[in-house]
Design a protein with these regions (language model features):
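Short, Lys/Arg-enriched N-terminal segments with co-localized hydrophobic residues
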Residues: 5-14, 275
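Catalytic core of DAGKc-family lipid kinases
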Residues: 119-199
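ATP/nucleoside-binding phosphotransfer catalytic cores, i.e., glycine-rich phosphate-binding loops
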Residues: 173, 189-192, 239-319
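Gly/Ser-rich helix-loop-strand patches that form or flank binding pockets
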Residues: 105-115, 122
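ATP/NTP phosphate-donor binding region
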Residues: 14-88, 92, 100, 129-146, ...
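Short glycine/serine/threonine-rich phosphate/pyrophosphate-binding segments
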Residues: 40-41, 96-102, 209-215
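Gly/Ser/Thr-rich active-site loops/lids in small-molecule metabolic enzymes
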Residues: 191-239
Length: 319
């Protein structure tokens, strides 16, 4: 942290001070692992648990992670219990794992640390190989903190609510695999914006702007920007371009025509849509706190994950 005081000469002096908060701030640490064949190995999870225990933290495991580990002396908790009792949660997996965990823990405001065992690792930015030394520094208070927004969406059919969910990346209204284009009527804050014929519409948070929205031609939004981006998917009219809105807006998408349509939230929960169903999307009241290693930068993440400043060689390899 930075301590600021005024000297006898009226000069403002600043000192950078690293304060150990391992026992005060992070007393109870939860470990949540990716399950199944490609999850973290039992030996790696056990090594992490032993490391945290030696540091004096109380270690708890998400229930399925504890079952995968196979030890008898573990404290196992549901995600709801972790949300109530843990001071921080370490999530080991890929971005998909982090998406699901973040959505469920957002109402509890538990800080999340991501250890990457997936492919890209936009949100799980600690490499598996350097997990222990990096976590040691972070749990001593040498870290960066940031907050990310979520979206909440409600589907109404004939005036009645039929489905509700939240999204960390995006809410996507899309056509069925065997159907033609859909026609969507879009309103923003009760103002008609347009009718759009396309394969669908992506409504994205700044976090999701580097995911499906980016692949569909949308802009990258900095996570600290209070915005929501609408990105058409393969629009019939080339004039239907992405647009960035304030995250204070309420967006309503009505299915004017189309077959086998659906709306999904982070590709993890979905429901079918019928003619004249209305999807209302707004910023959620909850947010997610991510903790990163000291010196972390969003621009470093973009440069590394999107391979900026790298150019193909004559052999086709990036340099």
């Amino acid at each position: 942290m930075c301590v600021q005081f005024v000297s006898s000469y009226g000069l403002i002096l600043r000192m950078s001070v690293a304060i150990s908060t391992s026992h005060r701030r992070f007393s109870t640490v939860a470990i949540i692992g990716k399950h199944g064949e490609f999850g973290a190995s039992s030996s790696a999870l056990g090594e992490l648990a032993d490391f945290l225990d030696r540091r004096g933290h109380q270690v708890v495991f998400e229930s399925a992670t504890a079952k995968d580990l196979g030890r008898s002396n573990l404290i196992a908790m549901t995600l709801e219990q972790i949300g109530r009792d843990a001071d921080v949660a370490i999530v080991i997996g890929g971005d998909g794992t982090m998406l699901g965990i973040a959505r469920q823990l957002a109402p509890f405001d538990v800080p999340l640390i991501g250890v990457n065992q997936g492919r890209l690792g936009f949100m799980t930015d600690i490499t598996f190989e350097r997990m222990l030394p990096v976590l040691s520094d972070m749990l001593d208070g040498k870290l960066e903190s940031e907050r990310r927004t979520l979206l909440e969406g409600v589907v109404h059919r004939q005036g009645k609510e039929i489905f509700r969910s939240v999204a960390f990346n995006d809410v996507v209204v899309s056509r069925g695999a065997g159907a033609g284009m859909v026609e969507l009527r879009v309103e923003v804050d009760a103002h008609f914006m347009y009718n759009q014929r396309s394969d669908g519409l992506i409504i994205s948070t700044p976090t999701g702007s580097t995911a499906y929205a980016l692949a569909a031609g949308g802009p990258i939004l900095h996570p600290e920007l209070g915005g929501i981006v609408l990105v058409p998917i393969a629009p019939h009219a080339l004039s239907n371009r992405p647009i960035v809105l304030s995250d204070s807006c309420e967006i309503v998408v009505e299915l004017a025509s189309g077959r086998d349509c659906s709306v999904n939230f982070d590709m993890q929960s979905l429901t079918s849509l019928y003619h004249h169903d209305r999807v209302t999307v707004r910023r959620s009241e909850h947010s997610i706190q991510f903790l990163h290693p000291e010196g972390w930068s969003y621009y470093d993440t973009l440069r590394e994950k999107l391979h900026w400043n790298e150019y193909p060689s004559v052999l086709g390899q990036l340099k």
